[in-house]
Swiss-Prot record:
ATP binds at G114, T115, H116, G117, K118, T119, T120. GO terms for biological process: cell division; cell wall organization; peptidoglycan biosynthetic process; regulation of cell shape. PANTHER family: UDP-N-ACETYLMURAMATE--L-ALANINE LIGASE, UDP-N-ACETYLMURAMATE--L-ALANINE LIGASE-RELATED. Pathway: Cell wall biogenesis; peptidoglycan biosynthesis. InterPro entries: Mur-like_cat_sf (IPR036565), Mur_ligase_C (IPR004101), Mur_ligase_C_dom_sf (IPR036615), Mur_ligase_cen (IPR013221), Mur_ligase_N (IPR000713), MurCDEF_pg_biosynth (IPR050061), UDP-N-AcMur_Ala_ligase_MurC (IPR005758). Cell wall formation. It is found in: Cytoplasm. This is UDP-N-acetylmuramate--L-alanine ligase. It holds the Pfam family Mur_ligase_C. GO terms for molecular function: ATP binding; UDP-N-acetylmuramate-L-alanine ligase activity. It catalyses: UDP-N-acetyl-alpha-D-muramate + L-alanine + ATP = UDP-N-acetyl-alpha-D-muramoyl-L-alanine + ADP + phosphate + H(+). Belongs to the MurCDEF family. Its EC number is 6.3.2.8.
Amino acid sequence: MRLPREIGPIHFVGIGGIGMSGIAEVLCNLGYTVQGSDASEGANVVRLREKGVKVTVGHKAGNVNGADVLVVSTAIKRDNPELMAARAQRIPVVRRAEMLAELMRLKSCVAIAGTHGKTTTTSMVATLLDAGDFDPTVINGGIINAYGTNARLGAGEWMVVEADESDGTFLKLPTDVAIVTNVDAEHLDHFKTFDAVQDAFRSFVENVPFYGFAVMCIDHPVVQAMVGRIEDRRIITYGQNPQADVRLVDLAPNGGGSHFKVMFRNRKTDAAHEISDLVLPMPGPHNALNATAAIAVAHELGITDATIRKALAAFGGVKRRFTRTGEWNGVTVIDDYGHHPVEIAAVLKAARESTDGRVIAVVQPHRYTRLQALFEEFCTCFNDADTVVVADVYPAGETPIVGIDRDHFVLGLRAHGHREVVPLPESAALAGIIADLAKQGDYVVCLGAGNITQWAYALPGELKALG
């Protein structure tokens, strides 16, 4: 039995969230009656309303009246008035991943997992399958610039989804093709130990059916070790590693992007194949690796080399992934979601490759617990930044932790040898600081998962206002 077409209103609590909004949009496009609520207005709420979805701002018990099912994410607390009202009325309550799994049951599915790179890789897989006339349905964790949304309903038999591992619910997703980009010690608030994180990713791959396959990056030592422990499943490895089945080679910066080729090696026959002259309009080795994963899937599904090459060269990127928000006197301002040390280091390396000028990082640490758990890593991931401007920690609902704040982070960066670290007293002071620091050819890279994205978009105009 599948999700009945005649089911009444499906109510999403927190419908404006990036994960929830994509599922709601696809359900709406399929003809289901969708409604929801969110704590505030936002771009996703506006977009859903334009599609005819009723969205209420604020969580109130009366919002669920008449709903046949309630969809919640793990961010919704047990004392949420809508959740409590639904349970009092015996309305079925499902987690976000469970509803996503219902949609995935309708299609053959590619699911992209990993601590970093999921959203970009999901977008790349979707782009290549779209170019190959697969017309996929897509549910992503970020806004795909080519679509102007994080979700689309396709008429084809394939679905491409971002598999969020943060709460372990990605194990519920019925996956035919799994991608694992990397595995780091993240989301320990849920998993408790890194061993548990690794076990979850291993289960994710082992859940792939015998007729499916997994694409795994063996440049990452944890993933390479995991490959050696997985039995009875078809694995395609990728990376710059000479042992990879799909190998990224001859990578070179190319005018703000990358130029490379990909080599395929069949382990059974030792036959080789090459796709040369690949151009990706995004900088950084990490993005070239993400593209290699997408190419591996596209090649396996029969998409031609020429189609892959053309689609990759036209890839429009993802919002908040090395997004240029504007320029001022030859200074480029970049907005990026990077909030983990591995991501920050990769983004700054990409910035360093993209300019002959200086790289100025503006970082808004996200969550006290993350800064505390990875303090050493945070203090050593800014090596490619000439200057680091440090804002207050974005709490994301957390209680402050003594000794884990902006000023201690500034001291930590300096103690680890960084030459120029500037504390940001308030967001209103950012334009003045950048105006004093930046020169023509410099990149200003705003990093974080909080509201720093708003600063990044406002900064070019604020700089122009200063003269």
